[in-house]
């Protein structure tokens, strides 16, 4: 399977938190994705980039917090995350190299 350069625009980065690490026991991996990425695009990108079989994709959007910076009111960017469920026997180790 060859990776299309557009797949790199869909997957921004892996999410490495305690909660995301606990999901690996359930064969799930969490990624930050582009805000306009759809579930089929995310599934295709993960399958092509990591050479695994994806059985499901759940997405969530975390709204950015309102903050004050130098007396000005601003807002952090919204973040879209995808929880990708892998087929039995497939794994993605995103914690190597830390």
Curated annotation (Swiss-Prot):
Biological processes, Gene Ontology terms: translation
Pfam families assigned to the protein according to its UniProt record, in alphabetical order: Ribosomal_L23
InterPro entries: Nucleotide-bd_a/b_plait_sf, Ribosomal_uL23-like, Ribosomal_uL23/eL15/eS24_sf, Ribosomal_uL23_CS
Coiled coil location: none
Source species, domain of life: Bacteria
Cellular component terms per the entry's GO annotation: ribonucleoprotein complex; ribosome
Keywords: Ribonucleoprotein, Ribosomal protein, RNA-binding, rRNA-binding
Annotated signal peptide: none
GO MF entries: rRNA binding; structural constituent of ribosome
SUPFAM superfamilies named among the record's database cross-references: Ribosomal proteins S24e, L23 and L15e
PROSITE patterns recorded: RIBOSOMAL_L23 (PS00050)
Function summary: One of the early assembly proteins it binds 23S rRNA. One of the proteins that surrounds the polypeptide exit tunnel on the outside of the ribosome. Forms the main docking site for trigger factor binding to the ribosome.
Family under the similarity heading: Belongs to the universal ribosomal protein uL23 family.
Quaternary structure and partners: Part of the 50S ribosomal subunit. Contacts protein L29, and trigger factor when it is bound to the ribosome.
Protein known as: Large ribosomal subunit protein uL23
């Amino acid at each position: 399977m060859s990776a299309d350069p557009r797949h790199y625009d869909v997957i921004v980065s892996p999410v490495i938190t305690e909660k995301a690490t606990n999901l690996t026991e359930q064969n799930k991996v969490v990624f930050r994705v582009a805000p306009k990425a759809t579930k089929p695009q995310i599934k295709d990108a993960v399958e092509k980039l990591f050479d695994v079989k994806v059985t499901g994709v759940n997405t969530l959007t975390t709204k950015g917090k309102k903050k004050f910076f130098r007396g000005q009111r601003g807002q952090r960017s919204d973040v879209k995350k995808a929880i990708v469920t892998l087929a039995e026997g497939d794994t993605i180790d995103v914690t190597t190299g830390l």
